[in-house]
Amino acid sequence: IHAEDLAVGYDRHVVVDDITLDVHPGGLVVLMGTNGSGKSTILRTLAGLLEPVSGDVRVLDEWPGGRAERVAYLPQHPKSLATLPLRASDVVRMGRFARLGLIGRATKEDDEAVETAMARMSVLQFRDKPLHALSGGQQQRVHLAQILARNADVVLLDEPTAGLDAQ
């Protein structure tokens, strides 16, 4: 990720400006700040969900969103899928959709990625449970497993531990 003199916000309203950032492969950056300070806006811009107000930003040498199959983003409050009849394993499998495309068929590699991600997040026991039957913390772990299953080159997590217990 490379950003120089980046300003982010909504429409022309700047929330955070003068952002200069370089994150190299294997790098880790933690954004810290008070509520409403613009952390989520920065992440949404890097994920390609918001246009930058000004400045230059590249993710994997492309404009944000240009390499969507290689970037995984978990918002602070994932959209509730609880109204859909989805099992936890279905939600985790959605992490593979960016690589499969609309008509791609899951392979053994996809199945293994889903199993491995669910095991890493300790949610294998919920595999066949409806998402809506899980607690908020369990749902968050399922969403984190979805991100892991994606095997993305860039992972953007917005408050990923919100609602999780100490284990």
Task: Give residue ranges: language-model regions.
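Conserved structural motif at the start of ABC-family nucleotide-binding domains
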Residues: I1, V15-V16, R127
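The feature captures the beta-strand-to-loop junction immediately N-terminal to the Walker
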Residues: M32-T34
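Helix-to-loop junction immediately C-terminal to a conserved catalytic motif
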Residues: A47
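Conserved ABC transporter NBD signature motif
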Residues: G55-E69
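Conserved ABC ATPase "signature" region
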Residues: R93, K108-F126
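Conserved ABC ATPase signature
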Residues: P130-L134, Q138
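Catalytic Walker B motif of ABC-type/P-loop ATPase nucleotide-binding domains
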Residues: V155-E159
